[in-house]
């Protein structure tokens, strides 16, 4: 276990020693051993969603946002070819998808929700019925700015019934919350190496329905982000088109091996759910309220209301918690002051209890009066 501060963030995460050790070797990007790692990763990622035989895994260099942009740019035809994206918005990462569509020149329709409201399948149904020109829906599964969980399966069935394509940003859910391609129809699920799989950042991937991907030649605005070209080239050569992040790929391979050894999705999701319960309960005991009701809270990252005290200031709070070995995340809401605490990654021997204790001691040091303070 690392002696560095533990990252209680939505990614990057604190990784295992085994994952760190995997990055100590250098790899040739065209070497057959490295190509075997890429092939193994692609199969393992498909296995998580039961997509073998129906879907393709296309990895891409860069942060998760690179892969979201690549998915939209590749799967959604340009406006002159009729592409039109509906983006329901209940947080910052939904807004980012809408911005991507605007920058790429894809026709865009948005539908706005409050930051603490789930996206409703009945709204998607009504919007698709109202405007048949919409070709795709782009949905954030777990909105990282709050931790809200949107009803992916129900929305996917609505989108399928209307004959449209669904692109899912699953950055903060993939590997911990169920997405089953056999039951939940989608054209693409997009995720990245540095979240619930507990790799390091630097690589995204798109799990695309093969039949949808096969129709995408010539759609993309970009050479580097063309998932169709990347897919065809990888299948032909077993290699990446451009220099891959070799150490990141090796780390994800090691992390994915550990993921399956530890019990896969059920075990990872269960561990995060336990962390989440202990976090919310522990901070509630200090008088800190979570932003979302439990029914719509994903066990990935939790947003808390900042203490209602003039003595509270986030930077001082952050530094005090950091001195005690934990790194938090600022809030990302527009209406109220908040901070965020992640439930992912390697939390050390004391687990979430150590983080709760660090928050308690930090707030006491700042002179805040706490509920149930010892």
Curated annotation (Swiss-Prot):
UniProt cross-references to Pfam families, sorted A to Z: Aminotran_5
Record's protein name: 2-aminoethylphosphonate--pyruvate transaminase 1
In-chain residues carrying the UniProt-annotated modification N6-(pyridoxal phosphate)lysine: 195
Organism field: Polaromonas sp. (strain JS666 / ATCC BAA-500)
Lineage: Bacteria, Pseudomonadati, Pseudomonadota, Betaproteobacteria, Burkholderiales
Cross-referenced NCBIfam families: PhnW-AepZ, PRK13479.1, transamin_PhnW
GO biological process, one term: organic phosphonate catabolic process
Record-stated family: Belongs to the class-V pyridoxal-phosphate-dependent aminotransferase family. PhnW subfamily.
Subunit structure: Homodimer.
EC number: 2.6.1.37
Gene: phnW1
């Amino acid at each position: 276990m690392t002696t560095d501060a533990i990252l209680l963030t939505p990614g990057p995460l604190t990784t295992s020693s085994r994952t760190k050790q995997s990055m100590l070797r250098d790899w040739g990007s065209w070497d057959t051993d490295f190509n075997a790692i890429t092939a193994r990763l692609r199969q393992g990622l498909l296995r998580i969603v039961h997509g073998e035989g129906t879907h393709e895994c296309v990895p891409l260099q860069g942060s998760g946002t690179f892969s979201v942009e690549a998915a939209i740019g590749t799967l959604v035809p340009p406006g002159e070819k009729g592409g039109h994206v509906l983006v329901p918005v209940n947080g910052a990462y939904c807004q980012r998808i809408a911005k991507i569509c605007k920058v790429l020149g894809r026709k865009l329709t948005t539908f706005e929700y409050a930051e603490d409201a789930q996206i409703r399948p009945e709204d998607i149904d009504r919007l698709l019925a109202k405007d048949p020109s919409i070709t795709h829906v782009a949905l954030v599964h777990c909105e990282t700015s709050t931790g809200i969980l949107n009803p992916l399966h129900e929305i996917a069935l609505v989108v399928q019934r209307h004959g449209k394509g669904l692109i899912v940003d699953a950055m903060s859910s993939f590997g911990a919350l169920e997405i089953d391609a056999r039951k939940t129809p989608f054209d693409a699920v997009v995720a990245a190496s540095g979240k619930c799989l507990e790799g390091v950042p630097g690589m995204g991937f798109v799990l695309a329905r093969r039949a949808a991907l096969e129709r995408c030649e010539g759609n993309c605005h970009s050479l580097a982000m063309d998932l169709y070209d990347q897919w065809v080239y990888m299948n032909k050569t077993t290699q990446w088109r451009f220099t891959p992040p070799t150490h990141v790929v090796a780390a994800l391979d090691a992390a994915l091996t550990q993921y399956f050894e530890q019990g896969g999705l059920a075990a990872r999701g269960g561990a995060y759910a336990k962390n989440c319960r202990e976090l919310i309960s522990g901070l509630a005991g200090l008088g800190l309220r979570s932003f979302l009701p439990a029914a719509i809270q994903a066990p990935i990252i939790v947003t808390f209301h900042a203490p209602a005290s003039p003595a509270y200031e986030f930077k001082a709070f952050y530094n005090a918690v950091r001195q005690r070995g934990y790194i938090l995340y600022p809030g990302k809401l527009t209406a109220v002051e908040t901070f965020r605490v992640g439930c992912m990654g390697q939390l050390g021997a004391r687990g979430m209890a150590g983080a709760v204790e660090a928050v308690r001691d930090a707030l006491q040091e700042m002179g805040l009066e706490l509920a149930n303070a010892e």
